[in-house]
Curated annotation (Swiss-Prot):
The gene is mtfA. Its main location: cytoplasm. Binds 1 zinc ion per subunit. InterPro entries: MetalloPept_cat_dom_sf (IPR024079), MtfA_enterob (IPR057256), MtfA_fam (IPR010384), MtfA_N (IPR042252). It comes from Cronobacter sakazakii (strain ATCC BAA-894). It comes from the Bacteria. This is Mlc titration factor A. PANTHER family: MTFA PEPTIDASE, PROTEIN MTFA. GO terms for cellular component: cytosol. Its EC number is 3.4.11.-. Its cofactor is Zn(2+). GO terms for molecular function: aminopeptidase activity; metallopeptidase activity; zinc ion binding.
Length: 265
């Protein structure tokens, strides 16, 4: 039985939230009791430091707030909450939102167009999300909007823009870059063969290194059984960077407990 220390020792600055209910999603099912408690402590601090801002009539309740915080803190469970410095607000739309996008083509002409976005993040600025896609981030499908945007934030700690190479030791950069680009090429080869819609990894990962890191971070936490065997070298680099092994958690969860001479209970 899990002992929930926040039930008796919550801070006055933050009312107790329904953490047990918030933890009851497939994405977090493999966490040990100790990991769950650590994640909740980080999430409490996250909600004390960041402001969740509902937009366009979206109603934010305690359970939604708790689950959003848990997903933000899962990638930094071992890195530490300071890795999420650099922003103070999370803006939440009820559904994907329209933004004005400006881009420059190959000959230098600047174009403007309105595009639909699921989420956005900048180095210094808020993270923007939408609730419809957040809800789809609770399972173990390989899609996770919050982890995707958090990965961009972690990536940008290494410079002014996301590059696909997070803040790692200099001696590891060349190997990381090699393995990441190899993964991009592999994903693109599959897209060329079967098409974007049939690809086993989100085709967005093949667009550039920053998106590859963000997309594969989604798979790292929510579909490790797809990531690890396909890109074993890059998987080990992700495990080392995040300080976690979601595939091991998945295997432990799926392995029946044996005791009393091998009898399954």
């Amino acid at each position: 039985m899990i002992k929930w220390p926040w039930k008796a020792n919550h801070t006055a600055a933050l009312a107790p939230l329904p953490w047990e209910a918030a933890l009851a999603i497939p994405l977090l099912a493999g966490l040990s009791d100790e990991q769950q408690q650590k994640l909740v402590r980080l999430s409490e601090r996250f909600l004390q430091q960041k402001r969740l801002v509902p937009l366009q009539g979206f109603e934010l309740d305690e359970l939604k707030s708790a689950r959003i915080a848990l997903l933000f803190c899962l990638p930094v469970l071992e890195l530490g909450l300071e890795w999420l410095d650099g922003f103070h607000e999370v803006l939440i739309y009820p559904a994907p939102f329209v933004v004005d996008d400006e881009w420059e083509d190959d000959i230098g002409l600047v174009h403007n167009q309105r595009v639909v976005q699921s989420g956005q993040s900048w180095q210094q600025g808020p993270i923007i999300l939408n609730w419809l896609d957040i809800q789809d981030s609770f399972d173990a499908s390989g899609f996770n909007l919050i982890i995707h945007e958090v990965a961009h934030k972690l990536d940008m700690r290494n410079g002014d823009r996301a590059s696909g190479i997070p803040l790692i030791a200099l001696r590891e950069v060349a190997g990381w870059e090699h393995d990441l680009h190899a993964a991009m090429e592999n994903i693109q080869d599959e897209i060329d063969l079967v098409g974007e819609s049939a690809a086993s990894i989100d085709a967005y990962a093949a667009t550039d290194p920053a998106e590859c890191f963000a997309v594969l971070s989604e798979y790292f936490f929510s579909a490790p059984e797809l990531f690890a065997p396909r890109f074993p070298s890059l998987w080990q680099r992700f495990c080392h960077f995040y300080g976690q092994d979601p595939l091991l958690r998945l295997r432990l969860r799926e392995t029946p407990a044996l005791s009393d001479g091998g009898q399954v209970h």
